[in-house]
């Protein structure tokens, strides 16, 4: 047989391609596919790299451990990088960083993100395009700062003070950016986070949709619980206070936008 057995979606259904024919997938087949994908992705996080505890940003690790203790999400006093990384599940039995540890704290700039600022609502002309490289925490901070520095602000005078209000609530921006790093598919080669500011919108793209194609609107409404692709990465983000354990980040972001009169939209691409 010829063709690719990886399913694709069209008109609300999933299909596989066999001998030039589009075969609809049954629900049981689709469930097994997603379960296999989830299992394989956990193996990616746990896979050993060529790097060790000396190849991390130790100051960042110390700060994360301190924050985790302050928030009551970890009971551990930092003594050394090796012990702390083990505590977070980020070292292999051979004392090497796994992929999750490298991407979270590595000083080898494992991630590349792309940022752009467009003066109109299309890509025909741009004011700035740049790339930034770093680990998850560094790229996350850069993305939030970039958006914050390029969106518009409304100003008013209160007494003798000038008050500026961002067109999009900064807390909502942070929630969406953090979730993009928590839920993305890091194993996808040649794909990058993209953060683009247009005249009337901000667009955040991350490689891969939420696991099992879950609609984040269902997270926000409480119809489904939190679903995690990156168990080790998300666990560390939770301990450090970047995300919570119940998938309420989307609800906060959507509520903040609604209260500020900001329209929002989410599109879930194929798994």
Residue ranges of each PLM-predicted region?
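A short beta-strand-to-loop motif within the catalytic HATPase_c
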Residues: 266-268
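Active-site helix-to-loop segments that bind/position phosphate- or nucleotide-bearing substrates
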Residues: 5, 17-191, 195-226, 249, ...
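Elongated alpha-helical scaffolds
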Residues: 1-11
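Glycine-rich phosphate-binding loop
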Residues: 226-256
